[in-house]
Regions:
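Juxtamembrane inter-helical linkers in multi-pass membrane proteins
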Residues: 198, 285-300, 335-349, 473
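The alpha-helix within a helix-turn-helix
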Residues: 192-193, 467
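Helix-loop-helix hairpin linking two adjacent transmembrane segments in secondary transporters
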Residues: 245-270
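Membrane-water interface segments at the C-terminal ends of transmembrane alpha-helices
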Residues: 27-58, 74-182, 210-231, 262-278, ...
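A short amphipathic helical element positioned immediately N-terminal to and/or at the very start
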Residues: 17-18, 63-72, 341-350, 478
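Transmembrane alpha-helical segments of polytopic membrane transport and secretion proteins
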Residues: 1-34, 278-314, 388-393, 554-574
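Glycine-rich helix-loop "coupling/hinge" segments at transmembrane-helix boundaries
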Residues: 230-254, 338, 503-532, 566-573
C-alpha cells in the first residue's frame, strides 16, 4: 500500500511539473527572442546603416563601390591604413614582450613585492588612454623635461603614439598573460628537474609552448585596441594620420559622412579578423587544461629573482612617472616657466568643457553600471541556464560576442546614421544621455557576458531541475540562489562597466551634445585648444573617481560577500 500511494503521488505530480516546465520554456523563449531583437536593434541594424551609407553619395543615392574606389585612389587616406598597421604591429610587439616578462616575474619567480608590482601595473586601467599622451607631452614635448633623450626626434607622431599605446594597453596584456602563465603544470617542471634540464631550455620547451595560446590571444587583443584607438593619436599624433583620426576628420571636420563610413569599414575588417582568431585561440587554451594538473609553485632562484625584481621595478617607476607627471602638469601654474602649484586648472573656465562634463561622466558610468549589469547578467543566465531552444541560445551567444569585434568609433558612427534617421521611431533618443548609455553597454557587453557565463557555469544545472520539481518559481530560484552565489561576479561586472564608461573616448566621440559632453571628451577638446594643463586636470579627475570606486568596491565586496558567501568558507574548511 505505501508503494501504491507513492506511485499515485508521482503520477499526479507529473502533469503539474510538465506544465511548469512548459511555462518556463515559453518564458525563456520569449526572453531569448527579446534579447535577440535588442541586439538587432542596437547592433546589427546600426552596422547595416553604416554599410548602406558607404554605398551612397551625399544626396543619398546608391553609387555602389564608388566611395571605396575614391578611398583606394586617395594616397593620403590610404597611407593612414599603413600608418595604423605600423603603429599597431610595433605597439603590440613591444607590449606583449614587456607584459610577458612582467607576468612571468609574477607567476614563475620568488621575487618580493609581487602584490605591489601587480597593483601599480594595473593603474593605467583606471585612466583614459589620452592621459598617457598628455604625460608624454610634458616629458618629451617641445618644452618637455626629457626632450633631449629623443635626440632630435619629435614626440608628436609615431614615437609618441607607440609609447602611449604601450602604456595604456600594458595592463590588458598583463592580465591575459598572467592568467595563461598561472595555469602551468608543476609536474612538467618537476620532470625537467629530474632530467637536469636547464632553466632556459625548460622555458623554451614548457613555459613558452604552454602559454602560446595566451600569447596569441593577447597579441590580437592588443593589436585591435591600438589599431582602433582614437584618443592617443588625436592628442599626440601630430600630422601622422591614422584611420581613427581620419574618420573623425571626415565626419566632424569635413561633414563627409560617406567617406567616414568607408574608413570605418576599413577599420572594422582587421578588428573582425582579430576577433575570430582570438576566439579560436581561447577555445584551444581551454582544451589544454587537465583535471590532473598541479599548481606550479616556483622555486627560489636568486639570479632570476633579482633580475625580474629590477625589471618590474623599472616598469613600475615608468608607470608612476607617467601618472605623476600628468598630476604635476595639472597643478603647476604655467609650464615650464612657473612651476609653483595651483588648483586654478581645475576651474575649467571653458564653457561646456568643465565640471558639467565631469558630472555627465559620472552619470553615464552609474547608469551603465546599473542597467548594463542587470541586462548582461540576465542575458547570460538565459544563454547558460535555459535547457531548451539551443538554436536561439546559439544565436544570442554569437550576438553577445560580436561587440568585441566592433571598434567603439565604428559603433558610435553607426549610431549616428541609424538613430538620426528621421523615419526611425527611436529617433527621440538621439542626442540624449540614453543613447550614450546604450552605446557603452553594447560596446563593453562581451567581456561582461563572458565573465557572467563563467560564473554561471560553476553552478550545477540540477538547481533548476530541483526547483522545478519543488514547484519553486524560476524567478524565486534566480533571486534566492543564483544571485547570491554569483554576487562576486555581479559586483565585478558593475565595476568593470563603471570604470570603462568613465574612461571611454572613441565610443562616444560622435554621440555627445553640448549638454552631454563627457570628461574624457572634454580632455581632448581642452588639449585641442592648447590648454594642456586643464586637459591633464580633467583626465586626473577620471582617475580619482575610478580609484575611489575601486576602493569602495573592494570594501563593499569584503563586507557583503562575507555574509552572502559564507557557504564557500564552510565548504573550504570541510
Amino acid at each position: 500500500m505505501p508503494m501504491f500511494k507513492s506511485n499515485v503521488f508521482k503520477t499526479r505530480q507529473f502533469p503539474t511539473i510538465k506544465r511548469d516546465q512548459d511555462l518556463s520554456d515559453r518564458v525563456g523563449k520569449l526572453m531569448l527572442l527579446a534579447y535577440i531583437g535588442l541586439f538587432f536593434l542596437f547592433l546589427v541594424l546600426p552596422l547595416g546603416a553604416l554599410i548602406i551609407k558607404s554605398l551612397q553619395n551625399s544626396d543619398g543615392d546608391y553609387i555602389g563601390l564608388h566611395n571605396f574606389h575614391i578611398y583606394l585612389n586617395e594616397p593620403a587616406l590610404f597611407q593612414s591604413f599603413f600608418n595604423s598597421l605600423f603603429i599597431a604591429v610595433v605597439s603590440t610587439i613591444v607590449t606583449v614582450i614587456l607584459a610577458f616578462a612582467f607576468a612571468f616575474a609574477l607567476t614563475h619567480t620568488r621575487m618580493p613585492f609581487k602584490g605591489f608590482f601587480r597593483l601599480i601595473a594595473l593603474i593605467p586601467l583606471l585612466s583614459p588612454s589620452i592621459l598617457a599622451a598628455i604625460a608624454l607631452v610634458y616629458w618629451f614635448g617641445n618644452q618637455g623635461v626629457l626632450k633631449e633623450l629623443l635626440i632630435g626626434y619629435s614626440i608628436y607622431g609615431p614615437i609618441g603614439i607607440i609609447m602611449a599605446s604601450v602604456y595604456w594597453t600594458f595592463p590588458h596584456a598583463l592580465m591575459i598573460l598572467s592568467t595563461s602563465l598561472s595555469l602551468s603544470d608543476a609536474r612538467l617542471y618537476e620532470a625537467a628537474d629530474v632530467l637536469h634540464t636547464s632553466k632556459f631550455r625548460a622555458f623554451l620547451t614548457i613555459t613558452g609552448p604552454g602559454a602560446r595560446y595566451g600569447i596569441i590571444s593577447t597579441t590580437f587583443v592588443i593589436f585591435t585596441q591600438v589599431f582602433t584607438d582614437f584618443g592617443v593619436p588625436k592628442v599626440i599624433g601630430g600630422n601622422y594620420n591614422v584611420l581613427a583620426t581620419d574618420i573623425y576628420k571626415e565626419v566632424v571636420g569635413m561633414q563627409n559622412f560617406q567617406m567616414g563610413a568607408v574608413i570605418s569599414l576599413v577599420l572594422l575588417l582587421p578588428a573582425i579578423l582579430a576577433f575570430f582568431v582570438d576566439q579560436y585561440s581561447r577555445k584551444r587554451q581551454v582544451a589544454l587544461l587537465s583535471s590532473r594538473s598541479v599548481v606550479f609553485d616556483p622555486k627560489k632562484y636568486r639570479t632570476l629573482d633579482m633580475a625580474m625584481l629590477a625589471f618590474c621595478g623599472l616598469i613600475t617607476v615608468i608607470i608612476l612617472m607617467m601618472i605623476g607627471m600628468a598630476q604635476f602638469g595639472a597643478l603647476v601654474k604655467f609650464w615650464p616657466y612657473n612651476l609653483s602649484l595651483t588648483l586654478k586648472h581645475y576651474s575649467f573656465e571653458v564653457a561646456g568643457l568643465g565640471w558639467e562634463s565631469f558630472y555627465n561622466s559620472i552619470r553615464l558610468a552609474f547608469y551603465t553600471a546599473v542597467f548594463g549589469t542587470v541586462i548582461i547578467f540576465v542575458g547570460s543566465y538565459i544563454v547558460e541556464k535555459l535547457r531548451t531552444q539551443e538554436q536561439l541560445r546559439g544565436i544570442l551567444q554569437f550576438f553577445a560576442l560580436l561587440p568585441m569585434a566592433v571598434p567603439g568609433l565604428v559603433l558610435g558612427l553607426s549610431y549616428i546614421f541609424y538613430f538620426n534617421a528621421a523615419n526611425n521611431p527611436l529617433n527621440f533618443i538621439y542626442a540624449t544621455m540614453a543613447i550614450m548609455v546604450i552605446n557603452t553597454v553594447v560596446h563593453f557587453y562581451t567581456v561582461s557576458h563572458l565573465t557572467a557565463v563563467t560564473a554561471l557555469k560553476q553552478m550545477d544545472k540540477e538547481f533548476e531541475a530541483v526547483s522545478l520539481s519543488l514547484k519553486v518559481p524560476v524567478f524565486k530560484m534566480f533571486w534566492r540562489v543564483t544571485l547570491p552565489v554569483c554576487l562576486p561576479t555581479i559586483l565585478d561586472i558593475s565595476i568593470y562597466l563603471f570604470v570603462n564608461a568613465m574612461t571611454t573616448v572613441s565610443g562616444v566621440i560622435f554621440l555627445y551634445t553640448y549638454n552631454t559632453t563627457l570628461a574624457s571628451v572634454s580632455s581632448i577638446h581642452l588639449d585641442e585648444q592648447g590648454n594642456v594643463a586643464a586637459a591633464a586636470a580633467m583626465a586626473m579627475l577620471i582617475v580619482y573617481v575610478s580609484v575611489f570606486v575601486r576602493v569602495l568596491h573592494a570594501i563593499i565586496t569584503r563586507g557583503v560577500l562575507w555574509k552572502t558567501q559564507a557557504w564557500r568558507h564552510r565548504a573550504q574548511e570541510t
